[in-house]
């Protein structure tokens, strides 16, 4: 059964004839620049952060963990559906080499061999954390609002929690375990520890 699933996934991947690499890492560490450089090669596609990992997580939670479906489990079908997210998401791309970008790959490394039957190849751009925090603060000072006119997500969280808008508080929030930098560092450490 397990081998049959792997064969179906292999066939689907070869049908679309694509090679997949994954990009994660720390925020404001050059992944957008790296994507632009990779895209100069006509055989490569590296877009903005994709919803592939969050979609797989949501499907896994729904198909494998939802009480409504546990009475009639279909693990093989669930695995095939989850495994189809990556190739289907990029089925419109003609390039044979795809770089899927999402910081969550570092905490879901097991998805790559588990669902796609390929060895994980994850590019993780990194940068000194002080430089990352400085970059965030500079970005906020240049433009405190998001594209849609709302206040930036960092200040929004501080205001919601009645915390003064200071650079120290912004940095503390970003580096906290719940912050974008803290989560990314933790994910990267987890991926490195698990090999």
Q: What is each residue range found by the language model?
A:
Residues 39-41, 94, 117, 194:
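Short, well-ordered coil/turn elements that cap or connect secondary structure elements
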